């Protein structure tokens, strides 16, 4: 009897010890939502090389610049970029004041819920929607409208607030590189004012470290108070070749670490790779149709084609969501 009891105690103690060891190991792992595959190993090895004093690849903290695309890299982008879904909701809200929209594209497609028709309108149609829904209000008014939208809007598939559609592995990566002296920036084709309304809370990246597309602003006095009014004119598009241009214009330093997910990020990765010393270039490849989506070369949103070919040819890191991420989204709040 005593022998059986003793064995049970030993078994329980071993189980507790193993569980405790697992907890300690997880706590010590800076990237617990990443599987122990090649991309994770490459990332950790790179960070250790550039932060270890005496290493031939050591980079001073002031030069540890990391840039991240947003759509499809830090958060989801299907069935359409979330800022466009916001703009579509604004079109529907404003439609009673504009009966002409029922017969005029791209507004007709928006009101009919015709996603294919909207995409067929191309960049011109999407920019027109953005201009009509964003312009005329102050930056403070726009910020408030965006914040209110995030409180009520839900993703059609996952039924979660859009600002919860962020990738847990990338949240961990942001925290990891910051803990190692990196300064993290968003460099995205999304609207800078839209991103500034949610990104500081979602990613712990302050507004002054967010580079994005932007429209023109106009200074005015309204009711005796100075305001900045959003105009229906594009000032800068932070996509493709615009990304390295934006990095130089608004950051002033070439990154040593850059992550994207589509052909729109190709030039940012090329610009990063062209610098001297150790460099990391990464792409998120959407390969998990069950937990997220699977798309690449033929997608209307987040197309990954030429950048993928270049990544393979040059040995950049390509992260497969299905194979390399143990978790996609954070737990629901």
Predicted regions span which residues?
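Short, solvent-exposed loop/turn and secondary-structure capping segments
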Residues: 77-80, 85-88, 197-198, 271
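N-terminal secretory signal peptides that target proteins for export/translocation
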Residues: 1-7
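Asp-based phosphoryl-transfer active-site loop
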Residues: 64-78, 269
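C-terminal cap/substrate-recognition subdomain and adjoining C-terminal extension
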Residues: 27-34, 41-44, 48, 63, ...
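Secretory-pathway/luminal and periplasmic proteins that interact with or process carbohydrate-rich
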Residues: 74-77, 117, 197, 208
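Non-catalytic pre-domain segments flanking phosphatase-related domains
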Residues: 9-10, 14, 20, 24-70, ...
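Short, solvent-exposed loop/turn elements at domain surfaces
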Residues: 52-54, 75-77, 219-220
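A metal-dependent, Asp-based hydrolase signature
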Residues: 80, 85-164, 168
């Amino acid at each position: 009897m005593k022998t059986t009891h003793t064995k049970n105690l030993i078994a329980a103690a071993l189980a507790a010890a193993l569980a405790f060891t697992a907890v300690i190991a997880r706590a010590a792992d800076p990237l617990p939502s990443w599987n122990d595959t090649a991309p994770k190993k490459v990332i950790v090895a790179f960070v250790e090389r550039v932060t270890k004093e005496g290493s031939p690849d050591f980079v001073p903290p002031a030069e540890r610049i990391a840039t991240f695309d947003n759509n499809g890299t830090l958060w989801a982008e299907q069935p359409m970029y979330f800022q466009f879904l916001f703009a579509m909701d604004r079109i529907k809200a404003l439609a009673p004041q504009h009966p002409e929209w029922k017969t005029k594209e791209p507004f007709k497609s928006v009101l009919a819920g015709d996603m294919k028709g909207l995409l067929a309108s191309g960049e011109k149609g999407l920019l027109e929607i953005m201009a009509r829904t964003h312009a005329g209000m102050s930056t403070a008014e726009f910020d408030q409208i965006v914040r209110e939208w995030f409180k009520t809007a839900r993703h059609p598939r996952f039924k979660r607030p859009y600002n919860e559609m962020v990738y847990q592995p990338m949240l961990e990566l942001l925290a990891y590189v910051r803990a190692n002296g990196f300064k993290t920036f968003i460099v995205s084709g999304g609207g800078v004012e839209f991103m500034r309304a949610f990104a500081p809370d979602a990613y712990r990246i302050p507004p002054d470290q967010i580079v994005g597309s932007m429209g023109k602003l106009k200074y005015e006095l309204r009711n005796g108070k100075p305001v900045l009014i959003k105009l229906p004119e594009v000032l800068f598009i932070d996509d493709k070749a615009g990304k390295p241009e934006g990095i130089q214009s608004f950051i002033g330093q070439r990154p040593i670490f850059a992550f994207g997910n589509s052909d729109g990020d190709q030039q940012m990765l090329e610009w990063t790779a062209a610098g001297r010393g150790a460099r990391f270039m990464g792409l998120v490849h959407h390969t998990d149709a069950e937990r997220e989506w699977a798309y690449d070369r033929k997608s209307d949103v987040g197309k990954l084609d030429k950048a993928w070919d270049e990544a393979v040819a040059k040995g950049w890191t390509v992260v497969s969501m299905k194979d390399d991420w143990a978790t996609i989204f954070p737990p629901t709040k």
